[in-house]
């Protein structure tokens, strides 16, 4: 049962081939057996999962249907879950049990999804490798010596290892799409405001967005259907009707205009990945898509702009974790200053501390105009580039990452090298656009992803293109050895 996709599970449950309780027990046993070598979970919720599975089976017995009813999932450990530890991968929140459910959690629970647990992540979602977690690094199921990507590495590794068919994740600068690329999954970052951020512990509030990680575009459509929608509790949520994402999957892409930015194929891109991207372009062209070279001239400025804006917002968001209001409190402080200093120094890891300091510096008097304001101006230019491009094309295609997954520890001493891995993903966050990564091949046995970007609220278009691609390729069906 563990090899089934979310769509296959939905059909199996509807046809009464197995029960949600049977499936849940099977997957929990599989996690117990195999996760010690992957480290994809921070917390397992066996008791909750079994009670939700029994309830889902009872709802089906009463005639209720639904693609998520009885389907097992997991939540990235920054979505608040009532009475269950929500750690953000940090010592700072190691003993925090949320008093309420995040909107994403409550919506999926109402749809009948079964929560198997909370997945590992980079501390406070800051990282591209899932090495900064207080609970240890996550291993890539395709090669346990390599990273799974971050910050949603736990969700990605759990799905890739066939512990469950799909999981929630978040994306601030590529944290859904990059792990999807590194673990041979399909991952979708929705339009900013499409999925509620209420109860989702913030890293950078103007960039964060929740979304699905799964093996196929079809599964992403199912999970996104349960996550998306307006939420009056989230001031950044946008009141836009949610379409039926599964309904448009089988639409022909003949005549669809796909733009390929020339700036994406620079010296920093692994030539083997470039070849796989070109192969995917040929596949889509063979399906009737029209390919056009485009330009995104300000793409080169994206990384410095992002690594001013995101840390600036993080330094503000994380100021509440001080040992007094929220979070870990040090023992036997000498005075109030010592309490603040030691609680934050001991509670936050090195990467979080680095980004807080960078952000505080960028917002400080004398540097605000030179750094933060200039970064926001670049953000506007990047958005303008996309708006101009979407006058000419319907979808933009390029590599998800410049390199395949690296070995664990290879970049820990060089944060800039890790930041540069976000080159192709962060622009979608800066502009608020939807983006999707889909499997496109392998380099040295490690998965490679291709990224698709679309105009605002065109998630259905991305899922349609990805589904048509997956009907004509088999990369997404490959399974890591040993899983």
UniProtKB/Swiss-Prot annotation:
<keyword id="KW-0648">Protein biosynthesis</keyword>
<dbReference type="InterPro" id="IPR036928">
    <property type="entry name" value="AS_sf"/>
</dbReference>
<comment type="function">
    <text>Allows the formation of correctly charged Gln-tRNA(Gln) through the transamidation of misacylated Glu-tRNA(Gln) in organisms which lack glutaminyl-tRNA synthetase. The reaction takes place in the presence of glutamine and ATP through an activated gamma-phospho-Glu-tRNA(Gln).</text>
</comment>
<dbReference type="InterPro" id="IPR004412">
    <property type="entry name" value="GatA"/>
</dbReference>
<comment type="similarity">
    <text>Belongs to the amidase family. GatA subfamily.</text>
</comment>
<keyword id="KW-0067">ATP-binding</keyword>
<dbReference type="Pfam" id="PF01425">
    <property type="entry name" value="Amidase"/>
</dbReference>
<feature type="active site" description="Charge relay system">
    <location>
        <position position="151"/>
    </location>
</feature>
<dbReference type="InterPro" id="IPR020556">
    <property type="entry name" value="Amidase_CS"/>
</dbReference>
<dbReference type="InterPro" id="IPR023631">
    <property type="entry name" value="Amidase_dom"/>
</dbReference>
<protein>
    <recommendedName>
        <fullName>Glutamyl-tRNA(Gln) amidotransferase subunit A</fullName>
        <ecNumber>6.3.5.7</ecNumber>
    </recommendedName>
</protein>
<dbReference type="GO" id="GO:0050567">
    <property type="term" value="F:glutaminyl-tRNA synthase (glutamine-hydrolyzing) activity"/>
</dbReference>
<dbReference type="GO" id="GO:0005524">
    <property type="term" value="F:ATP binding"/>
</dbReference>
<dbReference type="GO" id="GO:0006412">
    <property type="term" value="P:translation"/>
</dbReference>
<keyword id="KW-0436">Ligase</keyword>
<comment type="subunit">
    <text>Heterotrimer of A, B and C subunits.</text>
</comment>
<dbReference type="InterPro" id="IPR000120">
    <property type="entry name" value="Amidase"/>
</dbReference>
<dbReference type="GO" id="GO:0030956">
    <property type="term" value="C:glutamyl-tRNA(Gln) amidotransferase complex"/>
</dbReference>
<keyword id="KW-0547">Nucleotide-binding</keyword>
<feature type="active site" description="Charge relay system">
    <location>
        <position position="76"/>
    </location>
</feature>
<feature type="active site" description="Acyl-ester intermediate">
    <location>
        <position position="175"/>
    </location>
</feature>
